Curated annotation (Swiss-Prot):
Pfam families: DHO_dh. This is Dihydroorotate dehydrogenase B (NAD(+)), catalytic subunit. GO terms for molecular function: dihydroorotate dehydrogenase (NAD+) activity. Transmembrane segments: none annotated. Pathway: Pyrimidine metabolism; UMP biosynthesis via de novo pathway; orotate from (S)-dihydroorotate (NAD(+) route): step 1/1.
Amino acid sequence: MNRLAVEIPGLSLKNPIMPASGCFGFGQEYSKYYDLNELGAIMAKAVTPEPRLGNPTPRVAETASGMLNAIGLQNPGLEHVLAHELPFLEQFETPIIANVAGATEDDYVQVCSRIGESKAVKAIELNISCPNVKHGGIAFGTDPEVAHRLTKAVKSVASVPVYVKLSPNVADIISIAQAIEAAGADGLTMINTLLGMRIDLKTRKPVIANGTGGLSGPAIKPVAIRMIHQVRAVSNIPIIGMGGVQTVDDVLEFLIAGADAVAVGTMNFTDPFICPKLITELPKRMDELGISSLQELKKELLNQ
């Protein structure tokens, strides 16, 4: 019996560790470093209906304990991804989670209705941190009613389970999570980046051309842990946790907080081998701490 295995809707994971969307492309670059079959899953780069060039540069900047990015969902568009990117991933047994983004509800529905055409795609990750252009640019994920409606629309057309990625830039994460669960979401992924800014002292302007960017890396881990714990306290919905994972102890901390699996983002840029390293280290650390299975961890904090 594989004590690292995790079963959640649409995903039979050999282990709970995977690269987060936006930090792994579509896997081709990383496949030169190690066998992608080692991974629990792969969260692929965001896909929109049409190609996107992304935001002007500079769009990445280092910060203390993390980084800022404002990539702007640069991607080659749905047709290219279906024809060229996902076929590459079909050679691996590792389940693919397709990240989907858009500017309107119709954008999401269009991509989600077709992305499951690839036999590699076992689930969808719905990126609801995108600005809703029909409602003044407010992110889909900051309003429970809007998030509910979008999730329901996508569920009506998707051929694979739908996981919704929660934004931390909200006053009440629980109301957002409950609205999404009520709409039929199969799971949650959390958290996305926190909105941040850096100033260049010489130019007196933001370092990021876009002005603000998403803060990721170790700086946001305590926020991610807190929000996962909050949601787990009120729901049994499957959760893939992310936000600042660097070490195997971070992985265990996310699992104890209530996550079923864990995604690694920014650290892939620092160490391309981070995911296989964590997979190797996890059972050893479990032995050291007297942990027999991952399942015993998920509600340990709640039961105290």
